[in-house]
Amino acid sequence: MQSAMALSFSQTSFTRPNHVLGSSGSVFSTPRSLRFCGLRREAFGFSTSNQLAIRSNRIQFLSRKSFQVSASASSNGNGAPPKSFDYDLIIIGAGVGGHGAALHAVEKGLKTAIIEGDVVGGTCVNRGCVPSKALLAVSGRMRELQNEHHMKSFGLQVSAAGYDRQGVADHANNLATKIRNNLTNSMKAIGVDILTGFGSVLGPQKVKYGKDNIITAKDIIIATGSVPFVPKGIEVDGKTVITSDHALKLESVPEWIAIVGSGYIGLEFSDVYTALGSEVTFIEALDQLMPGFDPEISKLAQRVLINPRKIDYHTGVFASKITPARDGKPVLIELIDAKTKEPKDTLEVDAALIATGRAPFTNGLGLENVNVVTQRGFIPVDERMRVIDGKGTLVPNLYCIGDANGKLMLAHAASAQGISVVEQVSGRDHVLNHLSIPAACFTHPEISMVGLTEPQAKEKGEKEGFKVSVVKTSFKANTKALAENEGEGIAKMIYRPDNGEILGVHIFGLHAADLIHEASNAIALGTRIQDIKLAVHAHPTLSEVLDELFKAAKVESHATTRTGDAKIKLNTNQEDRKGRRRGGDDEKQPSVSKDLKDISTRPSSFFENISVGVLSLLSLIFV
């Protein structure tokens, strides 16, 4: 789900043996470090090479046939895997992750089926990202119309703004319906079989759906997503005590609503409710609001998004019991101290929204048939999304993507994981770098981030022995932001001054959710600051906020560029370019930290090609 924080579970590391067939044919074990529900804390490399070295042995990834795994199969009486298959790939769950995997699978020539027990689109399309953005679009326009000072600064005069609740709700519902139909039609158009019914794993390479339908596939992907997490002691009636599923229907706009949890979900709904006239009270178990964000960004966001609005908050407390409104009585919330568990306060409000994160939807999937034991409900997987059984061994031909594995509970992360799995089953090794996946909170202004927070980066630097630097730029110095009268905001980058590696970027300001992708792509490609600061940005645009950010970074003079030369040669001849493609300069490149593995790329050439392409296009237009 795009706007859902992972549950606040402590991060736990597990080391499991991974049995792999070596080049000599012998089976050897190599430790595999696994982490569950570690939002933004997993750093996996991105490998496109045809060979992967493990210890002194080499595993060949030249084709699907040469990539073999020794794994324990189920012995629960389900028998051996079938010799022939109905499909190349079966996907259980037709959310954003399953949809992305299905489209990529057909592109790779795989006969594909997708099973859905509810409606196509999953949480994101029907009860998450899509309808919430529709509501936030309304809240953004309401805020602008209600801000008399802001409108006068443009020379505009606007009468009092109002809204029709049902009309707003219809806008969100209609958008969800449209996107759901688009997803369904896109799969039908390319020949994906959409099977209706609850799907479960019956055994190795075997799936059951509906009452008694059994089908087989070479590979199976579990993509069942998540549901709202409701702590014990909270009674949800769907009317006065609600989850995000209910809130998105906007059946009412209460005068006073308590929001339990101040992560992505809670923060976005506070934006909607306050714009529509509600008073909001946050209840947060930790000592500060917005605990999942970079601390500096959290403080600024609180100053802009919380303090000036009709919002108060209680931090360091649990809602131990919430009783819905009934018999003319309001919603009753009992608060206790998060540390001592002593009673703290009692609140009486019109409604309460439970925004305490999401829990994996993995019950009833038949995981016991392949000896898989969940971890807090999450299905354990390795860095290639391969499912791991209770003995720490890979389950053959079984993968899990998205919220169900807990690696990064975002819709686009699920889609990326699905595409990564399809690459693997098609014969090309692919490991997704989760630190390059951006996240965004669509408040007004927006918040976005990619990579590590400042505390996380400094902790990593201390452990691995490198220095961490921080640089910031302000939206108040950006021409486009000032033209929009939206100068409130900053961009912040955490990086290594010794080699120019970008460790994290955080943005708070106008269209932050759109701006973050330049930084996320830089991290994904391993682009160094000394390279990307030479890129040209159109003026005047908001993208110049990042342009100034990159230029403000101080990289040590001895740090080399990605091509191994501190002086970028823009006028390189064809032979020089061929030499670089052959990898002649690769040996000179500085090593990237082990959490962000290098891939062969030349950012300077990329920007040169883009510039040449743009100039060529312009010449065609104006000649």
From Swiss-Prot:
Where found in the cell? Plastid, Chloroplast stroma
Q: Name one GO molecular function term.
A: flavin adenine dinucleotide binding
Cofactor(s) listed in the protein's UniProt record: FAD
Question: Mind telling me which GO cellular component terms the entry cites?
Answer: chloroplast envelope; chloroplast stroma; cytosol; nucleolus
Give the quaternary structure.
Homodimer. Part of the plastidial pyruvate dehydrogenase complex (PDC) containing multiple copies of three enzymatic components: pyruvate dehydrogenase (E1), dihydrolipoamide acetyltransferase (E2) and lipoamide dehydrogenase (E3).
The family line of this record is: Belongs to the class-I pyridine nucleotide-disulfide oxidoreductase family.
The protein depicted here goes by the name Dihydrolipoyl dehydrogenase 1, chloroplastic
The gene coding this protein:
LPD1
